[in-house]
């Protein structure tokens, strides 16, 4: 069904998209988002969330995960789980990102996250770009994690899940201080890679990691999309 003519009031709030789709008989509606796309170490995590329209009152503090402090994000994560009809998370390890490229890995993760939801959505909302093969009609929403409740919920689930993984990896690889920078490009992270070399949790297809892995003979061929992505990420701190 073409929803381009669906009216969504500018003051409809964070749940306006979902409510408009449900009114047209297109519920349940799932939101999908990822965390860790821009990191050079650790996994990328994709989450899909279907919110129970009767429990939206539990989500008064819901917002894009990047706008929440770590403490509040953990609390909102619990709120999302209480308000959700279904939640799924897909963890995509660094080796899979190296093998497929970050964009393809992201798309594959989105498809898998939607496919394993306990509730089958009739419509899927994604953040920023369209994704084919989700098993339901879908719509990309620019700045969806700011504007759409189920996408914001997915962003929180993905972020909290990934941060917990990175804190766990910190215990195994304390020299890289993953608990602090979560695998993103920072001066301290680069200094640690320079001193110790990349570990198995680093994405060797990323330019900055490959350059430091080269002396150890670990260089892999780089996809064009990863070269472009990493060029734009040099010196950038966490954004996902």
Swiss-Prot record:
This is Ribonuclease HII. A divalent metal cation binds at residues 33-34, 127. SUPFAM superfamilies: Ribonuclease H-like. One of its GO terms (molecular function) is RNA-DNA hybrid ribonuclease activity. Pfam families: RNase_HII. Its main location: cytoplasm. Keywords: Cytoplasm, Endonuclease, Hydrolase, Manganese, Metal-binding, Nuclease. It is an enzyme of class 3 (hydrolase). It comes from the Bacteria. Disulfide bonds: none annotated. One of its GO terms (biological process) is DNA replication, removal of RNA primer. Residues 27-226 form the RNase H type-2 domain. It is found in: Cytoplasm. HAMAP family: RNase_HII_B. Manganese or magnesium. Binds 1 divalent metal ion per monomer in the absence of substrate. May bind a second metal ion after substrate binding. The keyword Transit peptide does not apply. Transmembrane segments: none annotated. It comes from Parafrankia sp. (strain EAN1pec). Its cofactor is Mn(2+); Mg(2+). Endonuclease that specifically degrades the RNA of RNA-DNA hybrids. GO terms for cellular component: cytoplasm; ribonuclease H2 complex. It catalyses: Endonucleolytic cleavage to 5'-phosphomonoester. The lineage of its organism: Bacteria, Bacillati, Actinomycetota, Actinomycetes, Frankiales. Belongs to the RNase HII family. Its EC number is 3.1.26.4. CDD domains: RNase_HII_bacteria_HII_like. InterPro entries: RNase_HII (IPR022898), RNase_HII/HIII (IPR001352), RNase_HII/HIII_dom (IPR024567), RNaseH-like_sf (IPR012337), RNaseH_sf (IPR036397).
């Amino acid at each position: 069904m073409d929803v381009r003519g669906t009216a969504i009031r500018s003051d409809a709030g964070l749940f306006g998209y979902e409510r408009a789709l449900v009114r047209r008989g297109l519920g349940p509606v799932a939101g999908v988002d990822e965390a860790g796309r821009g990191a050079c170490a650790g996994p990328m995590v994709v989450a899909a969330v279907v919110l129970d329209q009767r429990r939206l009152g539990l989500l008064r503090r819901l917002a894009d995960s990047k706008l929440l402090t770590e403490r509040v994000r953990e609390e909102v994560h619990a709120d999302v789980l209480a308000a959700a009809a279904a939640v799924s998370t897909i963890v995509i390890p660094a080796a899979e990102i190296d093998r497929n490229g970050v964009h393809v890995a992201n798309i594959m993760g989105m498809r898998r996250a939607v496919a394993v939801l306990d509730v089958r959505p009739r419509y899927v909302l994604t953040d920023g770009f369209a994704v084919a093969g989700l098993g339901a009609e879908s719509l990309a929403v620019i700045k969806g994690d700011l504007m759409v409740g189920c996408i914001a919920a997915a962003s929180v689930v993905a972020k909290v899940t990934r941060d917990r993984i990175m804190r766990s990896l910190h215990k195994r690889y304390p020299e890289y201080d993953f608990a602090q920078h979560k695998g993103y490009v920072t001066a301290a992270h680069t200094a640690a890679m320079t001193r110790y070399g990349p570990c198995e949790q680093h994405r060797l297809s990323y330019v900055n990691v490959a350059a430091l892995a080269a002396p150890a003979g670990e260089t892999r061929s780089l996809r064009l999309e990863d070269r472009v992505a990493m060029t734009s990420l040099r010196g950038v701190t966490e954004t996902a």
